[in-house]
Amino acid sequence: MDTTPLHCLLADPSFAACYDHASLNAADSQRLAATPQLAQRQDWQVSRALKQQTDLPAVSLSHSQGFAALLCAPQPLTAGVDIEFIRPRDFKALSALVCTQEEQDFLKTANCPSETFYQLWCFKEALIKAANLDFPSDMKSVGYVFDSGQPVGLRAGKQTDWYGTSAILADTMALACVWKGKAVTLQWQFFGSLKPNDLTDRQTI
C-alpha cells in the first residue's frame, strides 16, 4: 500500500534570525498588514521562517515560547499539530476539565506527570484542529482510546480512524502530530539549533 509523506518541520527560537518579511505568502502579508505588531513577535518570526523552508502546502501550524511546528504534505491530508511549553500546572484540576475519566485514571499512573499530561493535551489540541472542532469545549470528546487502561488509539468524537505521534522536544516542549487514515509516513525536519536527538520520548498510536 502506498503511503503519503507528512512532513513535520520543527524550529527553535534561534530560527527567528531567518525570518524574511519579503518572502511572506499573500495570506500572511495581509494578516501582517492588518496587525503590524506581529512582526516583532518571536513566535511569528520563527513560524513564518519555517513556512518559507518548503514549497509544500501547509496543513497545520503551531507555536509556543519561540518554538514552532509545521505540518505539510504533497497532497491533501486531514492532519493537525500542536506544540506546548511544559510548565508546572495543577494537572489534577485541569485534567478534570478536559479529560475523560479513563484519561484521568491513566494520568494518575504516570511516572512523568507533566510530560504525560502535555503529550495528551497536544494530542487533544491537534485532533481539534484536524477535525475542525471547538476549543476548549470539545477537549473531552477527543483524545485516547483505551484497552486495559493503556492508550491504543485516538478518537475525535465518534471517529476512531485517527493516528498520531507525540514527543518531547529539547526537554522543554511537548508536541503531537495527528492524521486521519493509516497510510501516512511522518518525516521530521529540524531547523535553528535543533537536532534529531532533541526529539525524545516518541510515542506513536
Residue ranges, per PLM feature:
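Core catalytic alpha/beta fold that binds nucleotide/phospho-ligands
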Residues: 1-205
